[in-house]
């Protein structure tokens, strides 16, 4: 676990990160070893913070765990908020897809340095420095080489096949780690809580598809769902019909007279009610000289006087 400072805050707000050991080593070796950059989120198109290991040339996404009323004790200070940040490895090709899809609408081959351009997120050019980038681009683009320079054009067909492999790899990882996905798929599909689902192959594929969809645009997610032949989630099972209330302008009248059960009647009881054998025996007991139970709990008279 490591701590950092948010330089954008005048109060030098400290952040708590959970990092792999090799990332901590990289930060010690070089001040520029770890770079926090703002890049486009491939799913929403909004800006998001990512971590780049300049030494190992790896990309990490930042996940935040948040709970209310939590704080951190950091050395001799207290940091409010209690946020816990996680850095998890991420395939940079997901971020490049955003620019490849956008350029692909022009329908022509272009050099990569003309595709990955963003005035809003200028650090996107750092994605071009990752090793084996050209090898990865073959999964999602058509490629041409002219005068020793390579040109690329986005391919939907190749991308869907690549994403299908990602889904299959995710399914295998879920099974290997014995992750129960049945209940989670039920919850996300708004199934009835009464319906119990077992971990079927379809549940694994649907859950893996949902995980991958967090890194791609919705339109591409829908195309991937069709490729995987995922059926539409069934509608939620209806609850048993309740008695319908008649809605009208007039006030609803009670069908019974509930005033007959008031406290006075409950205290006195019905005069004509039959007594049990125990009640009859108690009635024959001589109660003369007995104090009421209220006498033991009544307030005592206090003596008052002037001083």
Curated annotation (Swiss-Prot):
Protein's UniProt keywords contain Ligase: no
Gene Ontology, cellular component aspect: nucleoplasm; ribonuclease H2 complex
Major site of localization recorded for this protein: nucleus
In-chain residues carrying the UniProt-annotated modification N-acetylalanine: 2
Cross-referenced InterPro entries: RNase_H2_suB, RNase_H2_suB_wHTH, Rnh202_N
Gene3D superfamilies tied to this protein: 1.10.20.120, 2.20.25.530
Subunit structure comment from the entry: The RNase H2 complex is a heterotrimer composed of the catalytic subunit RNASEH2A and the non-catalytic subunits RNASEH2B and RNASEH2C.
Name of the featured protein: Ribonuclease H2 subunit B
Chain positions with Phosphoserine modification: 292
UniProt KW Phosphoprotein keyword: yes
Function summary: Non catalytic subunit of RNase H2, an endonuclease that specifically degrades the RNA of RNA:DNA hybrids. Participates in DNA replication, possibly by mediating the removal of lagging-strand Okazaki fragment RNA primers during DNA replication. Mediates the excision of single ribonucleotides from DNA:RNA duplexes.
Alphabetical UniProt keywords: Acetylation, Nucleus, Phosphoprotein
Residues modified as N6-acetyllysine: 291
Localization of this protein: Nucleus
Family designation: Belongs to the RNase H2 subunit B family.
Any single biological process term in GO: in utero embryonic development
Gene name as annotated: Rnaseh2b
